[in-house]
Design a protein with these regions (language model features):
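Cys-nucleophile CN-hydrolase/nitrilase-fold catalytic domain and related Cys-dependent amidase chemistry
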Residues: 19-107, 173-200
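Short glycine/proline- and charge-enriched loop/turn segments
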Residues: 46-55, 117, 217-223
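CN hydrolase (nitrilase-like) catalytic-core segments centered on the catalytic cysteine
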Residues: 57-80, 141, 147-252
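Short beta-strand scaffold segments in enzyme catalytic cores
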Residues: 81-83, 94-97, 133, 232-234, ...
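A short, polar/charged loop-to-alpha-helix boundary motif
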Residues: 110-124, 249-267
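Cysteine/selenocysteine-centered motifs that mediate thiol-based redox chemistry or coordinate metal-sulfur cofactors
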Residues: 130-162, 262-287
Length: 287
């Protein structure tokens, strides 16, 4: 199939809302639909609280995966589903790839795990062990990174080299109280660069809303507040924004791409032909 329609869903957290928005996106003709990172629950990584470990589930038990498998089958859509995964005594930040027949093609576990006062993910997630992966779905070969992965050009390049035709980044990002800056433009430009450098469309879906941590004995009286800035977008193969959302409203973005035409453009530029991997030894060392 040459043409494919993708969608980014921007919303506050909640499974019921996610199901509703996926149905709406499918009704608009979307075939591959991206929801935000960890959309089932509030962004619990704002605090260190052992009680939040109970939010982790196995793939088989996860409510979002099970509900969206049915939606995928009924509407013939592909859904990368972000969730908090438990495997034995280990927990991961994971995306399950649900194909258009409702089957799970496989999973990707987040590689890069951030850690500061407002994004305390190292407390909850073990660094992923899957490596970057690409799935041959019903509509396209897709690669998926998760939030902080989107800041690393290596992530996108690995997926491109593995044959991805589209890149997807479920996200939960907002205000930066420590840095005291608005990171949104930087965030967008970073991924637009990945799209341009790999000559590959890219979809990013972020949540919205303000989420506040209430101090308690369980979280050592921590306090925190994050305002997620939405601004979800779809970039084309040149990195140009072809669809973009605002900062604070529920939105569904859709766009149709001609994968055959993009493949020819990618070949014509020669950026993969002219790579010199033998010269990139520094990439294997810490900076």
């Amino acid at each position: 199939m040459s043409k494919v329609t993708v969608a980014a869903i921007q919303m506050p957290y909640g499974l019921e809302t996610a199901v509703e928005k996926v149905r709406e996106a499918a009704a608009q003709g979307a075939q591959i639909i991206l929801l935000p990172e960890l959309f089932e629950n509030w962004y619990f990584c704002q605090e260190k609280n052992y009680e939040n470990y109970h939010l982790a589930t196995t793939l088989e038990e996860n409510p979002a995966v099970n509900e969206l498998k049915k939606i995928a089958r009924d509407f013939r859509v592909v859904l990368p589903v972000s969730y908090y995964e438990r495997v034995g005594n280990t927990t991961f930040n994971t995306v399950a790839i649900i194909d258009a027949d409702g089957s799970v093609l496989g999973q990707y576990r987040k590689t890069h795990i951030p850690d500061d006062h407002f994004y305390q993910e190292k407390f909850y997630f073990t660094p992923g062990d899957t490596g970057f992966r690409v799935w041959d779905t019903a509509y396209a070969k897709i690669g998926v990174g998760i939030c902080w992965d989107q800041w690393f050009p290596e992530s996108a390049r690995c997926m491109a080299l593995m044959g991805a035709e589209l890149l997807f980044y479920p996200t939960a990002i907002g205000s930066e109280p420590i840095l005291d800056c608005d990171s949104m433009p930087h965030w967008r430009r970073c991924m637009q660069g990945h799209a341009a450098a790999n000559i590959m469309p890219l979809v990013a879906a972020n949540r919205i809303g303000t989420e506040v941590v209430t101090p308690s004995p369980d979280n050592q009286n921590q306090t925190s507040s994050l305002t997620f800035y939405g601004s979800s977008f779809i970039a084309d193969e040149t990195g140009a924004l072809v669809e973009q959302a605002g900062r604070d409203a529920d939105e569904i973005l859709t766009h149709t791409f001609d994968l055959d035409a993009i493949r020819e453009l990618r070949r014509s530029w020669g950026v993969f032909r002219d790579r010199r991997p033998e010269m990139y030894g520094a990439m294997g060392h810490f900076g």
